Amino acid sequence: GSAAEVFSRRKELPEIMPGVNPGVVTALDCPAAFLRAEQEMEFVEKNRLSCLTLKDEAYPSRLRECEDAPIVLFFKGNTDFNRLHVVDMVGTRRATDYGKQFCADFLRDLAVLCPDVLVVSGLAYGIDIHAHRAALANHLPTVAVLAHGLDRIYPYVHRKTAIDMLA
């Protein structure tokens, strides 16, 4: 059912959805949680963010296959998360010169072989940020997966790259 139905029938969730985490029922029965959800939605609207749920066709199909896939993805920008070709690049935060060069060369060559590939990484120091910069340099779409909320860019020094990714 809808989110409103889940909320209105929160006490019945264990019977309706066997295996539901009891913490979910407790959280739904907390007025502060409802207020927090309203604040989140205001933030989403104010900052022109988008969200996808597991039921949305545009939700990343590969991620949906994971047992612990997030129920909701918040994002900013425009991309097809279900592209045929996706490469995830993550690595050390203390990238060596060799690692940085390999990242640049790999994405340069990949852009020639597969120009529609989507590059996914974090926004952390090291290989993550180098992957995004190399993707941008090669005109490849790139997506940053953040471990924190969308209310800030961290590390802040990567703000320009994050803005460039949205252009």
Write out the residue ranges for each language-model feature.
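Short, small/acidic-rich helices and loops at N termini and domain boundaries
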Residues: G1-E57
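Glycine-biased, small-residue-rich flexible motifs in mid-sequence functional cores and linkers
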Residues: E45-N47, T53-A167
